[in-house]
Amino acid sequence: MPAERKKSASMEEKESLLNNKEKDCSERRPVSSKEKPRDDLKVTAKKEVSKVPEDKKKRLEEDKRKKEDKERKKKEEEKVKAEEELKKKEEEEKKKQEEEERKKQEEQAKRQQEEAAAQLKEKEESLQLHQEAWERHQLRKELRSKNQNAPDNRPEENFFSRLDSSLKKNTAFVKKLKTITEQQRDSLSHDFNGLNLSKYIAEAVASIVEAKLKLSDVNCAAHLCSLFHQRYSDFAPSLLQVWKKHFEARKEEKTPNITKLRTDLRFIAELTIVGIFTDKEGLSLIYEQLKSIINADRESHTHVSVVISFCRHCGDDIAGLVPRKVKSAAEKFNLSFPPSEIISPEKQQPFQNLLKEYFTSLTKHLKRDHRELQNTERQNRRILHSKGELSEDRHKQYEEFAMSYQKLLANSQSLADLLDENMPDLPQDKPTPEEHGPGIDIFTPGKPGEYDLEGGIWEDEDARNFYENLIDLKAFVPAILFKDNEKSQNKDSNKDDSKEAKEPKDNKEASSPDDLELELENLEINDDTLELEGADEAEDLTKKLLDEQEQEDEEASTGSHLKLIVDAFLQQLPNCVNRDLIDKAAMDFCMNMNTKANRKKLVRALFIVPRQRLDLLPFYARLVATLHPCMSDVAEDLCSMLRGDFRFHVRKKDQINIETKNKTVRFIGELTKFKMFTKNDTLHCLKMLLSDFSHHHIEMACTLLETCGRFLFRSPESHLRTSVLLEQMMRKKQAMHLDARYVTMVENAYYYCNPPPAEKTVRKKRPPLQEYVRKLLYKDLSKVTTEKVLRQMRKLPWQDQEVKDYVICCMINIWNVKYNSIHCVANLLAGLVLYQEDVGIHVVDGVLEDIRLGMEVNQPKFNQRRISSAKFLGELYNYRMVESAVIFRTLYSFTSFGVNPDGSPSSLDPPEHLFRIRLVCTILDTCGQYFDRGSSKRKLDCFLVYFQRYVWWKKSLEVWTKDHPFPIDIDYMISDTLELLRPKIKLCNSLEESIRQVQDLEREFLIKLGLVNDKESKDSMTEGENLEEDEEEEEGGAETEEQSGNESEVNEPEEEEGSEEEEEGEEEEEENTDYLTDSNKENETDEENAEVMIKGGGLKHVPCVEDEDFIQALDKMMLENLQQRSGESVKVHQLDVAIPLHLKSQLRKGPPLGGGEGETESADTMPFVMLTRKGNKQQFKILNVPMSSQLAANHWNQQQAEQEERMRMKKLTLDINERQEQEDYQEMLQSLAQRPAPANTNRERRPRYQHPKGAPNADLIFKTGGRRR
């Protein structure tokens, strides 16, 4: 990048200051006539003193050199530190990305494992279901075949004679049939095989029908009935008759037993499937019972569980049902389930139609209940929004209805799966905005996506981490340290609950919402009694604390060492003022001091925190929340003490101890945010304060809202109640005549909880490439990353005009860049110009146009961008993108554009408008330090004269009065700028003095320019624009030469060489004159005036026709030459690396071309030099290439051709030189013939001939050294 002027200028300023000091030291007061007669000792002293400045000069130079070295080292260290910080940031970002990727991979692997485990579990369940279905099918099929073939296989009469027919055993067996269980299958089967029950069939049938079976016992009962049916022919008809009578008797029951109905229906279906009843008898009985159940249950659907049980266990055989779960398992795992072959499809169809009708009525009931539930929820939300809470009856009614709806929904889903039907659509009712308050987006932690911190619970990410991310003590602390503690806490809590149940209802420590409401009502009714109760409560509280203190002191006598540890811990607790320290303290307490007495000590220490240390409350609350999973009694005891202290202050109703009250309320709020203090209790505390909204209660309510109001208002479960209380508070503020201080506090608390909605700005959508360009320029660009950004910018598709225009536009809009990074954009542009020349031109034009547009529009909303543009223009000069003429033209425009010469007000520059002064100071502060030598120094001196006149003209306007004086910050800004640029400048003290300086300056330059100042002095330039143009011509090509002669780098500006510094130092010493300082005016020399007069009185160019003809002819010749050269072919020169001198000497010192072996070797080979690099060192090796190779032959031919061309050019040059010498010799002879020849006194020394026309000397060119004779 181009070398900055900043380094050189600072060094030159120091040199100028040192030179001025040296001059001041060297100057001596002129010796008067009275002081001339002095002793010789004084004269010698003066000579010794004259040596002092030289020593001082050397010391100052050494100090200056040391300072420069220190500054250079300091800058290098800063650069290294910045690079290290950047590397650290990049490493941290890489680590974060790696951690995120690792977490994502772990989550993905965990998800895949869970999916695989779920799939494996599903497969196992499907296989188990498949196996059970086939086993059940085979068992039923075998049992059905046996029962259908029973008439042919029943035993004869002689078989029964061998069985036991005793009354005792048979009656005992019949009694056992009333309590059939699956566990008794074997014993009952064994007893049945040994008994003759021919005379007890009726009793057995009655016992079986009246038996209280479970669903798991139905298979055992069906097995026993099969045994009866296979042995006794009259068992099945008797059983069928009893079942019919049993069902007829059940129709008369008002409240049938659903469990018995479910098992009976399943029992009949099982008896029909296994063939005890015929299909006609059994199916008709099942259909009648099922139809009666469904018809009686079409509205209430209380017997839906009976239908579901029937479909689950017997639906496949009776109704031909295939559940959706079975279908999906068969399709997914390619399983074949047993077909329904027992009953024909024609007999199954009525059951299917009946069940589908029932499911239709069930879905209608579900939709109806769903609508009613939504209506109830909507009404409850409205009541909460209006009143803040629900009545107990309504809340209980809603919970019961919601439970019945959930049960109905689950039954509907089960029946839909069994019938392979789809569930109906149940649309969710979207809450209206009015139900949540105006424009409030309630924060729900379960929502996917990022946290919306602007509309969420917490103010920022740090607050969220502080209140939510707590350390898990159970992961660090051994479980044995708090396991017993948890057991004891559970026992204590159980004892406390039993004690509280026995206590009377007016217990003061009750914390339920109802008790708080009762206390609130009592507050409103009986004020005097409450004050007494509050006093008694305070006494009880202090007694309790004192008793605990005495008890602990007695315990401490036995364990003094632990007491010292606990005391040291409690003393250091107020020093835990950050998250790490308080977390460490929590872990320390849990590891080393976890006893019941120490926990009480900790609670008391937290409770009696000093009222001035409000900063400790969030950390103490975090300590309590961290300890809560391991020792919950700390949070419970502290909350109960704070609750009691709060009620004491509310009931006391005094106007003292406001700091203690605020401390208690703030502590409650902090514990609420950690969810240690319940939201209901916090809201009821706020309600108690609002009930008596006066004096200290106002401050306490506002403090509570400012601590946890946003948390309560943004939480879904407490939003409605909080909004009602906030509205109540605002209504009380309007109705009551409160002090202005209280009004401000109430409004601040309200708007902190519920800030007014802000309009969200719509972000403009841009193409990705434009977004990347803006990211590079506006985010990534910094002093350290300039080189990287330049590399990325060079990779852009610059051939695309749209991309180039957008980059130029982004650079012109410099106000989008951070103010401290504007110089980085100028640095970047200077490096980019080497590859894209037109970009720099367009950017400079755009910046100048924007500055001009700002002066024309002159609106305050553009002031910041105008400051940035002015700063950018100065930085462009620092990086040699513009010349000084552009800077001074802009500065003069600030003091002249739109300014009326007569001083009348202008709309472009109003009297009270001082922003142009700020723009001038901004440019001068940016690049004015480089105008310290040469013509640019004189230009700045001249401009400062006009600038002072502009400032004093602004000060003299009538707008500024004693009541409304001229802004003092503008004066300070001007003085700071001028002190930096011209420390010795003499400022004007009035408008007249500034005008007089301008007139003197204009008159002086008019005289120097040799112009007549009679008329022109009257019409002289008002603001020095013509003067600036003349000075630009006077500066000549020095600026452009300086601009074009230096290459640019990206990282740091180039360091100037020592020779340039010496030349600039000499120039500074020669031109170290200031037109505005008194010393410079006094030290003006006659030599400078004479030089100026020579410039003014020199030859002047007179335009004539011959000049125009000459210019036209020259242009024509140049054009023809260009056209001729464009048609020629361009010959590409071959690269020929020069051989080092020491190798040339070695080659020349080789063997001569004489005879012998050396001659043959040199004739057969040609020496070449091979260049190699090893590390940073170059190595040369001589190779003798044979002449037979193509490389040597081509090189030899090329050398011969060059030698011939060289000899031809030499001969041609010699001929020209000889011809010119002959012509000159003839002219000399003619001139000598006209005048006598001078005597040659030195014949032996022949002078070298110098050709008057500058002809070349061939001997010098070709180094022949010979003489022509």
Swiss-Prot record:
Chain residue ranges for the region called Sufficient for interaction with UPF3A and UPF3B: 709-926
A GO term for molecular function: RNA binding
Residue ranges of the region described as Binds to UPF3B: 837-857
Annotated region (Sufficient for interaction with UPF1), positions in chain: 94-132
GO biological process, one term: response to unfolded protein
The keyword Protein biosynthesis appears for this protein: no
Any Gene Ontology CC annotation: perinuclear region of cytoplasm
Location of the protein in the cell: Cytoplasm, Perinuclear region; Cytoplasm
Region (Sufficient for interaction with UPF1 C-terminus): 1081-1269
Domain of life: Eukaryota
Necessary for interaction with UPF1 as annotated region, ranges: 1102-1195
SMART domains for this protein: MIF4G
Stretches the record annotates as Sufficient for interaction with EIF4A1 and EIF1: 755-1269
Residue span of region Disordered: 1-125, 143-162, 422-444, 487-518, 1017-1090, 1218-1269
Keyword Cytoplasm: yes
Basic and acidic residues biased stretches: 427-438, 487-511
UniProtKB keywords: Coiled coil, Cytoplasm, Nonsense-mediated mRNA decay, Phosphoprotein, Repeat, RNA-binding
Domain MIF4G: 168-396, 571-755, 774-984
Coiled-coil annotated residue ranges, if any: 57-133
Function in brief: Involved in nonsense-mediated decay (NMD) of mRNAs containing premature stop codons by associating with the nuclear exon junction complex (EJC). Recruited by UPF3B associated with the EJC core at the cytoplasmic side of the nuclear envelope and the subsequent formation of an UPF1-UPF2-UPF3 surveillance complex (including UPF1 bound to release factors at the stalled ribosome) is believed to activate NMD. In cooperation with UPF3B stimulates both ATPase and RNA helicase activities of UPF1. Binds spliced mRNA.
Protein name: Regulator of nonsense transcripts 2
Organism: Mus musculus
Name of the encoding gene: Upf2
